[in-house]
Amino acid sequence: MINVFIPHRWNNDDYSTISSLLDRTKFKVRDYSVPASSPFDSIDRRYNVDPQIQKQIRYASVVVCSNRPANNNGMSIDEIKFALSIGKPVVAVQVTFSSSTMIAGLGVETIPCRKDSLENWIHRNV
């Protein structure tokens, strides 16, 4: 069982792209991301990452984000930074031709949006 957290925004389809890619891997996946169907009632803005989301990230074995430049700021990058700070393995799946400079600057590996690439990365990092 691989526990996964996917930092995302709901204004693009990165979450569904990454979720579908995970579903095609040979791993049984438990998704700890925040689904659109049951978002948290409120986000505590006193924190860079809301404690409810921190808890979800702590449950995850890995964090899988997109390479989208929109991840350069906002909650997604804060979630990625938090995951790295607590030692979670983080990978960016290449869903666009352009990549986030922030994600690259954090040393997050970017892999092709392919099942075998994600499986190999998980094997190396879990």
Protein language model features and the residues they cover:
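C-terminal helix of von Willebrand factor
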Residues: 111-126
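Glycine-rich, charge-decorated loop segments at or immediately adjacent to ligand/cofactor-binding or catalytic sites
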Residues: 97-111
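Conserved N-terminal substructure of TIR/SEFIR domains
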Residues: 1-59, 126
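Conserved TIR/SEFIR loop-to-helix hotspot centered on a Trp-containing motif
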Residues: 69-86
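A short helix->loop->beta-strand "cap" motif at the edges of active sites that frequently abuts
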Residues: 85-95
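Structural motif corresponding to alpha-helix initiation and N-cap regions
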Residues: 46-50, 77, 115
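Structural motif
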Residues: 61-64
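Short, polar loop motifs at secondary-structure junctions
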Residues: 33-35, 94-100
